[in-house]
Amino acid sequence: MATINQLVRKPRAKQVVKSNVPALAACPQKRGVCTRVYTTTPKKPNSALRKVCRVRLTNGFEVTSYIGGEGHNLQEHSVVLIRGGRVKDLPGVRYHTVRGALDCAGVNDRKQARSKYGVKRPKS
């Protein structure tokens, strides 16, 4: 334990918190252009073809982003909005594309949890 005198001379160092989403640069979302749209397989206990895309962000970062929901309209040169949020069974995928923003369309025929997939309220 440090004495009061020692703490007066040299205060305690603040702990630096490392960001889980460095490419966002402390912003809630970032815009980017798809450089590659492809599918990849998840880690060991799971099996699927997960839809992901490589995105070149406006700040120069190139990141891998997950495309949630059933079906998508993204291709190379599509402009997308990226938010934070990793995909646990895809190593290196730390971002999600925002559905229903910019060039990324919302999910078709989605009735529940619509706000997460960029779907307007259906005409009852």
Curated annotation (Swiss-Prot):
<keyword id="KW-0687">Ribonucleoprotein</keyword>
<keyword id="KW-0488">Methylation</keyword>
<dbReference type="Pfam" id="PF00164">
    <property type="entry name" value="Ribosom_S12_S23"/>
</dbReference>
<dbReference type="GO" id="GO:0003735">
    <property type="term" value="F:structural constituent of ribosome"/>
</dbReference>
<keyword id="KW-0689">Ribosomal protein</keyword>
<dbReference type="InterPro" id="IPR012340">
    <property type="entry name" value="NA-bd_OB-fold"/>
</dbReference>
<dbReference type="GO" id="GO:0015935">
    <property type="term" value="C:small ribosomal subunit"/>
</dbReference>
<dbReference type="GO" id="GO:0000049">
    <property type="term" value="F:tRNA binding"/>
</dbReference>
<keyword id="KW-0694">RNA-binding</keyword>
<comment type="function">
    <text>Interacts with and stabilizes bases of the 16S rRNA that are involved in tRNA selection in the A site and with the mRNA backbone. Located at the interface of the 30S and 50S subunits, it traverses the body of the 30S subunit contacting proteins on the other side and probably holding the rRNA structure together. The combined cluster of proteins S8, S12 and S17 appears to hold together the shoulder and platform of the 30S subunit.</text>
</comment>
<comment type="subunit">
    <text>Part of the 30S ribosomal subunit. Contacts proteins S8 and S17. May interact with IF1 in the 30S initiation complex.</text>
</comment>
<protein>
    <recommendedName>
        <fullName>Small ribosomal subunit protein uS12</fullName>
    </recommendedName>
</protein>
<comment type="function">
    <text>With S4 and S5 plays an important role in translational accuracy.</text>
</comment>
<feature type="modified residue" description="3-methylthioaspartic acid">
    <location>
        <position position="89"/>
    </location>
</feature>
<dbReference type="GO" id="GO:0006412">
    <property type="term" value="P:translation"/>
</dbReference>
<dbReference type="GO" id="GO:0005840">
    <property type="term" value="C:ribosome"/>
</dbReference>
<dbReference type="GO" id="GO:0019843">
    <property type="term" value="F:rRNA binding"/>
</dbReference>
<dbReference type="InterPro" id="IPR005679">
    <property type="entry name" value="Ribosomal_uS12_bac"/>
</dbReference>
<keyword id="KW-0820">tRNA-binding</keyword>
<comment type="similarity">
    <text>Belongs to the universal ribosomal protein uS12 family.</text>
</comment>
<dbReference type="InterPro" id="IPR006032">
    <property type="entry name" value="Ribosomal_uS12"/>
</dbReference>
<keyword id="KW-0699">rRNA-binding</keyword>
